[in-house]
Amino acid sequence: GLNDFQKQKIKFTFDFFLDYNKDGSIQWEDFEEMIKRYKEVNKGSLSDADYKSMQASLEDEWRDLKGRADINKDDVVSWEEYLAMWEKTIATCKSVADLPAWCQNRIPFLFKGMDVSGDGIVDLEEFQNYCKNFQLQCADVPAVYNVITDGGKVTFDLNRYKELYYRLLTSPAADAGNTLMGQKP
């Protein structure tokens, strides 16, 4: 099973990335709210074509997540169902490629939420804005960003984000994956 620290991180992903209306469960309405927030953070820069593409992608994500986690088939994924899905998934997950399809599809979307300039790299200012816009409790943003970039040796691009997101979900101990929660390891 998962240790308490892993459960805490999985709970963060549930609360922060999925349960947008904070009612303790995930349903389609949370995905709709996510699109609204994404548009706000990106200052309405989402074209109609991008919006339609994102909506279709999120509909696919919702179907996949629901199919994996909605044990009682009530069109709602509870925290308990979500945790049970991750306990099963993490037991066999060895890389980003082993993550559920809905989760892999979400990674570029989440990265774009940080990379508001669209240049493919999240700089310190974008990371600071991300922490502020999403109310992350981050006491020292530059220090956290320094962990993300390994002291400037690594570019904070989509591949780095994938690695950190995988570690956030699967690592049994505090490591660089914590930075996506605004925390140092």
Curated annotation (Swiss-Prot):
GO MF annotations in UniProt: calcium ion binding
Keywords in alphabetical order: Calcium, Metal-binding, Muscle protein, Repeat
Binding residues for Ca(2+) 2: 70, 72, 74, 81
Gene3D superfamilies associated with the record: EF-hand
Disulfide bonds: none
Domain EF-hand residue range list: 5-41, 57-92, 102-137, 138-173
The keyword Transferase appears for this protein: no
UniProt xrefs under InterPro entries: EF-hand-dom_pair (IPR011992), EF_Hand_1_Ca_BS (IPR018247), EF_hand_dom (IPR002048)
Positions contributing to Ca(2+) 1 binding: 19, 21, 23, 25, 30
Record: residues binding Ca(2+) 3: 115, 117, 119, 126
Misc. comment: The sarcoplasmic calcium-binding proteins are abundant in the muscle of arthropods, mollusks, annelids, and protochordates.
Role summary: Like parvalbumins, SCPs seem to be more abundant in fast contracting muscles, but no functional relationship can be established from this distribution.
Protein name: Sarcoplasmic calcium-binding proteins I, III, and IV
Originating species: Branchiostoma lanceolatum
